[in-house]
């Protein structure tokens, strides 16, 4: 993806580092995640307690910074922090990591396979950034739909990130 979007060597390295480490704390138990939140003074909401899978983005960012000092930059850590929920005013690299994680080839759900095909096919008359934004919006829509249908809590950051992209698309 970095090549498709013409990232600089430095940005490519930052994105690559974040991609390698984005799930570094994913296998930790909810109790271990809460302990890491205390250690790193990370605030979390009731949403995180209801959906513990969200913790790993925040804890992973801080853990990676601590464990890989000098390799993991604050920018790479921010990419890790937002790779699950997104955020308002997402950067190009944040969108790329979120999407790469969401549509990676190990994801076999039909809707994600379709989204992966949509992303990698020719964007038609749209420029690449518009195509990326449209794909990220579609990814958020799939995520929200899945969470609604399975009766799970939806994180406010995801809704805000999605709405932000839609509002900006209209301008």
For the regions a language model picked out, list residue spans one by one.
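His-Asp-centered metal-binding catalytic motifs of divalent-metal-dependent phosphohydrolases/nucleases
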Residues: 12-45, 60, 78-86
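Alpha-helical segment that forms one wall of the substrate-binding/catalytic cleft
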Residues: 56-66
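Active-site metal-coordination segments of metallo-dependent hydrolases
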Residues: 46-58
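Divalent metal-dependent phosphate-bond-processing catalytic cores, especially two-metal-ion Mg2+/Mn2+ enzymes
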Residues: 1-9, 21-25, 66-74, 81-171
